[in-house]
Amino acid sequence: MGDLSANSEPVLTREQARAWALEAGFQEAGLVALPYAAETRDAERFREWVAAGRAGTMGYLKRKSEDGQLLRERAEIPFPWARSALVCFASYTFPSEPLSTKTAERGSAWIARYAWTSRVLPSRVLVGRGDPKGERRPSDYHKVLLKRIRAVEARLHEQLGEFESRAYVDTGPIVERALATAAGLGWTGKNTCLIHQRLGSFGFLAVLLTSLDVSEGAREQATPASNDRSPGAPAGSVAAGQWPGLQVADRCGSCTRCIEACPTDALDVPYQMDASRCISYLTIEHKGPIAEEFAANMGRQVFGCDICQDVCPWNRKSQEKALHSGPMAVDAELVPRPELVNPALEWLASLDEQSFERQFNGSPVRRAGFLGLKRNVAIAMGNSELARFAPRLEAWTAAADEGLRIAARWALTRLRRD
């Protein structure tokens, strides 16, 4: 996989790293040498974003090193030995999925599709336009993808010997999207999501940091061109998936659908998100009461939000390609759980703490917490205009939890007003 000749240090080559990542079950992978060309710019933008208070109460994004640098400014701050990053993409889109932006049965909720994941038995299926067949069991994408990226890590160690390495799936002090962009997996859209030209933005990222150098040829290919956010392609850029590791052109062009669709104006500036206003942040990370100005615009979202991605033309294109390409290989460990697609608010409200733990064991939904989900359900009930939810909300107005109690009172007032 690299140069193992006498008196030479082992190095990574893009072709072999990508091949092994795809063999491990990822749909795409890219390799970038550290530091990468745009790292200083990206670090400055991250510092400015945090300083502006756009991280909300997410303290983990504000953690600093002993010398006062934000850990997530660049990977080399927490990991000074890091010389390269292998970034892998696993798609969780599915061609027959409904959209959060489409009309649904009244009284239904929306759980972000990344939290729908389950695995199908047997382990691999081929489907056309229908759903995969077989028994489904909940799956935790963190565990699924960490197992895959560690398999790649182990294979690298087998071939190249001892070196420093660290694998992460959503849990490390790194900005995965910046590394993915530098590795050529896509561009950062106006909704701040990584967009892969063929696969869209509905994907998980797994990162393997290593102390290995990237081969000189790969380093030359991986040097990003400057990205001025213009609709045109920067010099040296290519289409996503053609040569992972090259800078991918920003293909958002003049489109502003994501900005216009955001109900809480979290995307107030293109390519920037005010996380403190984002429905995903409010329903998952934010603890306690949710301000009325946000609650009234949260609609039926009870865990996360897909609106800015559901309106993105690149996601529609990726699903259309899947629909019309005949039988396609589906990631059997990341298929939707039917009961989490447009679930009934009554069902979510009826869960006690024990059934919540059982239903969402290993699921991202657990991050919101039992009471956090109830708070979100109360708000969705208030936005539903359905009087039948009033008795449940009445009971919650006496809840010990402040967030749930205030949400229930607000929801009741809203229902009675409507």
Range-by-range predicted roles:
Residues 366-368, 397-404:
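Short coil turns that connect the paired helices of HEAT/ARM alpha-solenoid repeats
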Residues 2-224, 243-249:
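Auxiliary alpha/beta "docking" domains used to position bulky ligands
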Residues 336-371, 378:
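Alpha-helical adaptor scaffolds
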Residues 355-359, 386-397, 417-418:
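Amphipathic alpha-helical scaffolding segments comprising HEAT/armadillo-like alpha-solenoid repeats
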Residues 197-220, 224-228, 246, 274-294, ...:
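Short, charged low-complexity linear segments at domain edges
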Residues 374-386, 406-417:
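Structural detector for internal amphipathic alpha-helices that build alpha-solenoid repeat scaffolds
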Residues 36, 257-280, 287, 300-330, ...:
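Iron-sulfur cluster-binding cysteine motifs and their immediate structural context
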